[in-house]
Amino acid sequence: MTDVPALRRGLAVLRVLAARPGPISAAAIARELDLPRSTTYHLLAELEAAGFVVHLAAERRYGLGIAAFELGSAYLRHDPLERLAAPLLRKLADRVGHTAQLGVLHGNELLYLLKERPSAPETLVTDVGVRLPAHLPASGQVLLAYLPHAHVRALYPRSFVTRTGRGPTSPAELRQALAAVRSRGWAVEDGQVTADFASVAHAVFDHNGRPLASVAVTFRHVCESGCTRTWPDLAQETATTAAALTRQVGGKPPPTTR
């Protein structure tokens, strides 16, 4: 193997291991990557020597090594998601004239990482570092919508809190809301976090097509119901930004995403 193809194949092995819930056999890796077994064992040996793979001989399986953990930890220290998202969110806020935010899931809560305001900002209760129940803001709903059903059930086994009396209050209502998000391709909430404010959001996906973060626009909503006709326009703007960030982090949308 020459250096460049070998490097690409080695990285592909690491991605396969990272996508699995636990260690797997060399044969499984070879099948998934359509590689000869001899090539797979050679790659695994090199990765093991470098500390990126650990061989569990008793189980005849391979898992990620400590070097992979160290690399992941270094990635987090560099705050790459926030650094990549900041200029995109600034442009989004300027285009739509509303506050743009980046959020991530922490259990059943939505944590805001970034907030970019337009030149004439509106006062919001959400800010960087603020956590909210993930089932209320559009930012959280769009992430929950792309999680496995069993994961969502584990996060929400019973009834949950509301802030304004709006939003899902039971697992059944949440399932219905998330199904609508998946069908639509984006999430929307009206007054579930703060009265007289609404938001729309799209998901950012990682290289496995899993929800990584959300891009949202929040705006004051005090008008007749007819003003909702502008929401698809705002949703398209968030979709453009979320898709750009997905590409920049090396991600891809899941096959079912519209």
Where do the protein language model's features map onto the residues?
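Sensor-regulatory modules in signal-transduction proteins
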Residues: 204-207
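Short, basic/aromatic recognition patches
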Residues: 84-92, 155-201, 247-248
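Amphipathic alpha-helical effector-binding/dimerization core
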Residues: 58-158
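Short, structured helix-loop boundary elements
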Residues: 3-7, 61, 65, 78, ...
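N-terminal helix-turn-helix
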Residues: 1-83, 243-251
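Juxtadomain coupling helices with adjacent low-complexity linkers
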Residues: 177, 184, 195-196, 212-258
